[in-house]
Amino acid sequence: MNAKALYKKKALRDRRKLRIKSKLAGDALRPRVSVFRSNRYFYAQAIDDVKQSTITHIDGRKMGFKNTQEDAKKLGTLFAEELKKAGIERAVYDRNGYLYHGVVAAFAESLRENGIAL
């Protein structure tokens, strides 16, 4: 990709991110689960937007997981356990401007399969 294409790709993601963020908000009972994916790793955190604090997080890099669908499913299972320990059974899924496809979708499906209502 050349520089112009990368700029356009990032600009489109930023526009999607603002559009999504304007419609989502999390609180203590139903936090916002925000995801970030780099080229190599996957991260997620549960955020209480009222207190502006992170309730819990998971770091795929520290756990040795890569940015693949199989690893995203494993991370989803582990993150669902962390959310249940914190007493959370419902959440709002913030895909952070990423398309709901591949790793982002696999993580969300794994959360749903493990009892977290999104």
Swiss-Prot record:
SUPFAM superfamilies: Translational machinery components. Keywords: Ribonucleoprotein, Ribosomal protein, RNA-binding, rRNA-binding. The keyword NADP does not apply. GO terms for cellular component: cytosolic large ribosomal subunit. GO terms for molecular function: 5S rRNA binding; structural constituent of ribosome. It comes from the Bacteria. InterPro entries: Ribosomal_uL18_bac-type, Ribosomal_uL18_bac/euk. One of its GO terms (biological process) is translation. Part of the 50S ribosomal subunit; part of the 5S rRNA/L5/L18/L25 subcomplex. Contacts the 5S and 23S rRNAs. This is one of the proteins that bind and probably mediate the attachment of the 5S RNA into the large ribosomal subunit, where it forms part of the central protuberance. Belongs to the universal ribosomal protein uL18 family. PANTHER family: 39S RIBOSOMAL PROTEIN L18, MITOCHONDRIAL, LARGE RIBOSOMAL SUBUNIT PROTEIN UL18M. This is Large ribosomal subunit protein uL18. The gene is rplR.
